[in-house]
């Protein structure tokens, strides 16, 4: 709790600073003259007249396949807004949008190989990943925690010592857990699962004592599942997760175009409507998320 209070205090301070910048910008009458955007990813999109977006259909409510067979979700909807603005930003008359399905491993390959221009799921922005990929403005913040069985005498993080823990492979939570165990910060046996569904089955069958993962992903994919009535989540979070849209590092101007659309969207009621659509039944946006949107709504 102290950690999140510190973050909140810093963001509120940043809010005050940003408000001052916005007011100053509003008083400025300087013309905004921009050169045409260019770069390798932008050129690829222009040449193909197509924006290719990767998404993981197993990361609801951030990315999933809807009943109509089309991609949907909180991050997917943000990327649809980005796509709608790219036509104008790149001065194109026509641009198709192509969606490809990926998973927790192939999403990185899709961006690195150039098969996809954007990755729109629930990808965490970390310092390690920034060495290989570029990330947009932060789109969501949440904490990682543990899901346990209702009948288990496990109430807090300390109770997980010497227990068997499941985690979805190729995720930041998996990496964090491996580091914590290797450094001696946590004593536990880690078992990797291919998905939250597989991890949920392990927990139900008592093959593991808990599942580690991002809180909202676990709530949506485990607690809401047919096995969900048998599980609960611990109240404590052990790590923050900062989600963002992932893309190639080779094109800073493409990243700027994505960020410009996100920042402008954060100024409007649209972002609140998206939040309510995908998370309204789970929780209301707290001060942390409100500050996140406010501090990234940069002036022109």
Question: Residue spans of the language-model regions?
Answer:
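Short helix-initiation/N-cap motifs at beta->coil->alpha
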Residues: 38, 92-109, 152, 190-202, ...
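Bilobed "Venus flytrap"/periplasmic-binding protein-like clamshell domains
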Residues: 55-61, 71-88, 124, 142-196, ...
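A ligand-binding cleft/hinge motif common to bilobed small-molecule-binding domains
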Residues: 106, 120-132, 176-183, 204-239
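Periplasmic-binding protein-like
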Residues: 57, 140-151, 215, 223-263, ...
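Acidic, polar ligand-binding/catalytic clefts
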Residues: 80, 84, 91-159, 298-300
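Extracytoplasmic small-molecule ligand-binding "clamshell" domains
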Residues: 28-119
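Ligand-binding clefts/hinges and TM-proximal coupling segments of bilobed small-molecule sensing domains
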Residues: 28-36, 175-191, 229-231, 262-300
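Extended ligand-binding regions for polar small-molecule ligands
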Residues: 27-42, 77-85, 151-154, 158-164, ...
């Amino acid at each position: 709790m102290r950690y999140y209070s510190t973050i909140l205090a810093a963001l509120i301070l940043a809010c005050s600073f940003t408000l001052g910048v916005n007011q100053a910008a509003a008083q400025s009458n300087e013309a905004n003259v921009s050169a045409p955007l260019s770069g390798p990813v932008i050129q690829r999109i222009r040449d193909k007249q197509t924006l290719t977006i990767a998404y993981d259909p197993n990361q609801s409510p951030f990315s999933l396949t809807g009943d109509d067979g089309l991609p949907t979700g909180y991050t997917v909807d943000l990327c649809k807004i980005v796509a709608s603005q790219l036509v104008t930003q790149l001065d194109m008359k026509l641009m198709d949008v192509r969606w490809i399905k990926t998973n927790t491993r192939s999403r990185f390959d899709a961006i690195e190989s150039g098969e996809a221009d954007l990755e729109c799921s629930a990808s965490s922005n970390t310092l390690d990943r920034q060495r290989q990929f570029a990330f947009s403005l932060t789109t969501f913040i949440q904490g990682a925690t543990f899901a346990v069985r209702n009948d288990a005498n496990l109430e807090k993080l300390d109770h997980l010592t010497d227990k068997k823990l499941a985690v979805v492979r190729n995720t930041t939570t998996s990496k964090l857990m491996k580091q914590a165990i290797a450094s001696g910060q946590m004593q536990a046996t880690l078992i990797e699962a291919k998905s939250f569904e597989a991890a949920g089955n392990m927990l139900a069958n008592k093959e593991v004592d808990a599942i580690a993962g991002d809180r909202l992903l676990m709530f949506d994919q485990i607690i809401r599942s047919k096995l969900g009535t048998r599980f609960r989540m611990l109240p404590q979070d052990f790590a923050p997760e900062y989600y963002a849209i992932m893309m190639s590092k080779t094109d800073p101007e493409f990243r700027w175009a994505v960020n410009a659309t996100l920042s402008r969207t954060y100024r409007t009621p649209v972002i609140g409507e998206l939040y309510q659509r995908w998370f309204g039944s789970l929780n209301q946006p707290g001060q942390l998320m409100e500050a996140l949107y406010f501090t990234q709504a940069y002036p022109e």
